[in-house]
């Protein structure tokens, strides 16, 4: 009895190894993605995780947005901690300086909005051990004009939270990381070579205001590189969101647990990700080179009360802290000039530090252990090389096979001597060529159809059950692909089916790589890096298939061998010939005729070859030839007999070439996009885009199974099909939200201060927000008006408004005002000059430090804005090119007035509009409507702020 080959291309080994590869890699990827590495028992000198956690608990006790009294308390605590750390270290004096910045202000514009902001940043400068010159000389030169040098490193985190969240992850972990960096770098053994600037900025949540104020301080010109610490979730791993260039990114490589993909960087670069961080200011406006390290999931807890210490962990703190230490230490140890600009590019007052030019980068991690980074130009060169070399190499192999008479691809017939033979041997080389594209198209169409079905019937199920959606799509693609591939193989078996599938995969990945190459060269998009490895693996696997054919007999030898009667000349179109032949009764000895085979009991004979043999004998003079001896093993049932000569184990090498690298790289991208996108439809993003992304990635993940799937027996596909049915049913009928994955609804209360009328609004997903509002006590019996929001990025949502509980943001703060009615919350006056197009608007809000002046939409806006006390800066334009229709005012003092001078075009009418003041402090129960929403929301929903203020009190004005 022949021994079973455990590596042969038969169902058992194929099922075992294919399932083992995919299951093992999927499990490993999910473990790395979902589990945060444990913090070490021993930390580096200067790092105290217990103290870091204590700091995090203290600064996140209450909501602390810029416009809240709790924000002042957090600032006082941070100042105390910074002073305590500096005092406890040996490094001090001229080496470390604390800057309590209560002076910097900035006036700038974005679009049709002007912002005046007064900063309250905390800055600590640690002079580098190799920096001999003073690093801080405020009086020496204005910002934007200072000496060129090799620069230092800026590390930034913001200590303000949003008005609806405690800010543990956004950005409390970043803040305590900065405190630990201060403790670490002020250890004498850790003294950095380059100056390190530690910035705790205030006001990031409202318009990146704190970073803008930092630009006004002279010390902003010291650093040439930066590390920005952020948070957009609650716990988990901190990923490197984006980076400016290859040279900076290489220093992240020292992180003990890297977690990053350039795909997220491309998302920011191409504006697919709407939110912004201080990275934008440091890179685009200050000219620094650096990177963003941030938490990114779960987004359902972002900017809510669940962004708390309860939802994060010390492991998450260590993950960010360890990455920050490694990256900052590396950058601060770089004494080269790669981050320095040249003299000839220095232009006074450009506002940008001269940091040289970096190269676009490609980066990704492998299982959170290895970090790969190289230049985008290198990727482009490799792509072009593969696109040229791979086809030429395959053409060469094809030519070699043809010369060796072993090219069975597309071969219909073979002849013993020449095409003049009467009866050629049929090789069926075309059989199976069109199977893979048909199977691939049908399976892909099914998952795309499921995507549209989900969008139609239950689009938000991916909000709480993204992995159920993944299971549905993966199982659907696999089961459909198996059904058609196995069916085709059963009807028309072909030994070339695997090779033809690889040829089609080669063609498809060639087109994909060509597309990625164009994107990388013309648009600097690096997220297609996986296509390079995808194509390379398929190319090598296909090369093995070509080499495998060199083990086959020559077509001529096989034809002669078949003609001898030892093997059948050809097989019918079905794969049942062998079985059918075995069921026919053998010809008895007594029935032997002149055409009976010499092998008794075998119906195969020379009769069908007699005519051909006669012609051959006539042509060749009845020459005698030695019988052709071919050691053909039994082929897989139903497949071409010549394939019995092929090695049966090469398929495993092919599987290992195409599957693991695809699963690892595409799987990591799939998990990253899942975390980043699956809860964005609740913010107004398109759910169809997310489902189609899942469908595309499903196809990319499972396509490498295509060459092998026809060997699977029915057992595994049946189980997978049952999983598909179960997940389809679940995804169609399950409620999309849960206590763990709450739907965010966005709150704001608007008060007409002249009349006292107030309207509370909740914005959320259509169909769900109405249910939420209807159950609120204050909305019962009231007329609820639901309309589409005006904001372009929330057109997919619905805003429901009703008369809410009156706000008490001023009456309880009696120390700020003796007035108890809403009219006293905001005072303003307008003074006009002799000129017909100028006016000064004085605004004073009670118990607030944030107000706005909004010009009506029918007016073109103002062309000049000057705020009393503002310092001009040539780097900032107070008004954009199209004018300003909104002026946002922020003051570091409470209830402090603003005097704003505005100018408008002479040909326009005098502006009119609204003056609005904001109240954002929800800690003391001064906003009963918000407290009511928090209290009465169903367990599957949670409130968040929709704008800078929870309460907007307004009065109308006319110049």
Curated annotation (Swiss-Prot):
Its main location: membrane. The chain crosses the membrane at residues 14-34, 379-399, 433-453, 464-484, 499-519, 525-545, 646-666, 689-709, 717-737. SUPFAM superfamilies: Zn-dependent exopeptidases. Residues 35-378, 454-463, 520-524, 667-688, 738-959 are vacuolar. Zn(2+) 2 binds at residues 170, 205, 303. Its EC number is 3.4.-.-. Residues 1-13, 400-432, 485-498, 546-645, 710-716 are cytoplasmic. Keywords: Glycoprotein, Hydrolase, Membrane, Metal-binding, Metalloprotease, Protease, Transmembrane, Transmembrane helix, Vacuole, Zinc. One of its GO terms (molecular function) is metal ion binding. The record marks 302 as: Transition state stabilizer. It is found in: Vacuole membrane. GO terms for biological process: proteolysis. Its cofactor is Zn(2+). The active site is at residue 204. Residues 128-149, 566-594, 606-635 are annotated as: Disordered. InterPro entries: Fxna-like_M28_dom, M28_fam, Peptidase_M28, PFF1_C, PFF1_TM. Residues 612-626 have a biased composition (Basic and acidic residues). GO terms for cellular component: vacuolar membrane. It is a multi-pass membrane protein. CDD domains: M28_Fxna_like. It holds the Pfam family PFF1_TM. Glycans are attached at residues 48, 102, 105, 685, 785, 818, 834, 864, 899. May be involved in vacuolar sorting and osmoregulation. This is Vacuolar membrane protease. It comes from Phaeosphaeria nodorum (strain SN15 / ATCC MYA-4574 / FGSC 10173). The lineage of its organism: Eukaryota, Fungi, Dikarya, Ascomycota, Pezizomycotina.
């Amino acid at each position: 009895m022949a021994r079973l080959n455990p590596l042969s291309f038969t169902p058992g080994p194929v099922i075992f190894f294919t399932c083992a590869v995919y299951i093992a890699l999927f499990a490993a990827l999910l473990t790395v993605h979902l589990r945060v590495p444990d913090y070490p028992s021993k930390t580096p000198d200067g790092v105290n995780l217990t103290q870091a956690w204590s700091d995090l608990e203290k600064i996140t006790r209450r909501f602390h947005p810029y416009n809240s009294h709790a924000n002042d308390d957090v600032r006082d605590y941070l100042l105390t901690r910074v002073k305590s750390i500096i005092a406890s270290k040996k490094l001090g004096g001229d080496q470390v300086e604390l800057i309590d910045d209560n002076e910097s202000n900035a006036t700038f514009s974005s679009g049709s909005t002007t912002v005046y902001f007064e900063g309250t940043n905390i800055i600590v400068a640690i002079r580098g051990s190799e920096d001999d010159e003073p690093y801080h000389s405020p009086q020496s030169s204005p910002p934007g004009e200072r000496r060129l040098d090799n620069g230092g490193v800026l590390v930034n985190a913001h200590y303000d939270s949003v008005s609806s969240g405690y800010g543990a992850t956004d950005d409390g972990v970043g803040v305590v990381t900065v405190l630990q960096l201060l403790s670490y770098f002020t250890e004498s053994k850790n003294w950095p070579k380059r100056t390190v600037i530690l910035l705790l900025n205030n006001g990031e949540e409202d318009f990146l205001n704190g970073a803008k104020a930092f630009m006004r301080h002279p010390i902003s010109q010291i650093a040439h590189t930066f590390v920005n610490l952020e948070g957009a979730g609650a716990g988990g791993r901190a990923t490197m969101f984006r980076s400016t260039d290859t040279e900076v990114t290489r220093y992240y490589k020292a992180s003990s647990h890297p977690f990053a993909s350039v795909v997220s960087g491309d998302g920011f670069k191409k504006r697919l990700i709407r939110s912004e961080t201080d990275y934008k200011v440091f890179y685009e406006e200050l000219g620094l080179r650096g990177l963003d390290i941030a938490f990114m999931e779960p987004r359902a807890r972002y900017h809510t009360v669940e962004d708390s210490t309860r939802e994060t962990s010390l492991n998450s703190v260590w993950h960010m802290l360890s990455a920050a230490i490694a990256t900052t230490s590396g950058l601060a140890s770089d004494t080269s000039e790669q981050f320095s600009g040249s003299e000839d590019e220095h232009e006074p007052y450009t506002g940008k530090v001269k940091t040289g030019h970096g190269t676009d980068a490609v980066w990704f991690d492998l299982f959170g252990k290895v970090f790969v980074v190289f230049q985008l130009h290198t990727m482009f060169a490799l792509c072009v090389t593969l696109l040229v070399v791979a086809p030429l190499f395959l053409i060469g192999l094809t030519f070699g096979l043809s010369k060796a008479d072993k090219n069975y691809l597309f071969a219909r017939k073979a002849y013993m001597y020449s095409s003049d033979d009467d009866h050629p041997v049929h090789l069926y080389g075309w059989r199976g060529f069109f199977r893979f594209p048909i199977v691939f198209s049908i399976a892909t169409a099914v998952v795309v159809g499921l995507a549209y079905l989900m969008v139609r019937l239950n689009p938000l199920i991916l909000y709480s059950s993204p992995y159920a959606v993944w299971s549905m799509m993966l199982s659907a693609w696999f089961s459909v692909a198996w059904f058609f591939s196995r069916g085709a193989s059963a009807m028309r078996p072909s030994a070339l089916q695997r090779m033809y599938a690889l040829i089609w995969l080669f063609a498809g990945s060639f087109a994909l790589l060509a597309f990625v190459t164009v994107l990388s060269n013309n648009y600097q998009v690096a997220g297609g890096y996986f296509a390079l490895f995808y194509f390379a693996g398929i190319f090598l696997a296909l090369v093995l298939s070509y080499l495998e054919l060199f083990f086959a007999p020559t077509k001529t030898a096989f034809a002669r061998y078949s003609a001898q009667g030892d093997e059948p000349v050809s097989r019918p179109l079905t794969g049942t010939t062998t079985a059918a032949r075995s069921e026919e009764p053998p010809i008895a000895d007594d029935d032997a005729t002149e055409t009976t085979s010499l092998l008794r009991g075998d119906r195969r004979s020379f009769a069908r070859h007699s005519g051909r043999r006669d012609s051959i004998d006539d042509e060749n003079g009845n020459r005698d030839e030695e019988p052709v001896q071919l050691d053909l093993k039994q082929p897989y049932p139903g497949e071409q007999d010549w394939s019995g000569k092929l090695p049966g184990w090469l398929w495993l090498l092919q599987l290992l070439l195409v599957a693991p690298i695809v699963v690892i790289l595409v799987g990591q991208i799939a998990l990253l996009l899942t975390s980043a996108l699956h809860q964005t439809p609740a913010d107004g993003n398109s759910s169809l885009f997310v489902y189609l992304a899942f469908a595309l990635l499903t196809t990319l993940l499972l396509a490498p199974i295509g060459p092998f799937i026809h060997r699977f027996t029915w057992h595994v596909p049946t189980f997978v099909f049952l999983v598909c049915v179960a997940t389809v049913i679940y995804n169609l009928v399950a409620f999309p939200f849960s206590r763990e994955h709450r739907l965010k609804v966005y709150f704001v209360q608007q008060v007409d201060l002249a009349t006292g009328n107030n309207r509370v609004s909740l914005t959320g997903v259509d169909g769900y927000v109405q249910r939420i509002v209807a159950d609120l006590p204050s909305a019962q019996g009231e007329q609820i008006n639901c309309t589409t929001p005006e904001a372009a990025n929330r057109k997919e949502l619905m805003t429901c408004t009703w008369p809410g509980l009156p706000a008490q943001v001023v009456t309880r703060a009696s120390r700020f005002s003796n007035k108890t009615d809403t009219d006293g919350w905001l005072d303003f006056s307008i003074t006009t000059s002799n000129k017909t197009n100028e006016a000064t608007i004085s605004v004073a809000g009670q118990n607030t430090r944030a107000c706005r002046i909004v010009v009506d939409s029918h007016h073109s806006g103002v062309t000049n804005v000057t705020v009393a006390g503002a310092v001009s800066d040539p780097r900032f334009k107070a008004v954009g090119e199209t004018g300003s229709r909104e002026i946002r005012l922020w003051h570091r003092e409470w209830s402090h007035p603003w005097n704003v001078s505005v100018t408008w075009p002479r040909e326009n009418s005098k502006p009119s509009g609204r003056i609005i003041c904001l109240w954002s402090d929800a800690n003391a129960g001064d906003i009963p409507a918000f407290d009511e929403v928090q209290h009465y929301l169903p367990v599957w929903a949670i409130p968040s702020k929709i704008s800078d203020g929870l309460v907007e009190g307004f009065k109308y004005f006319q110049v």
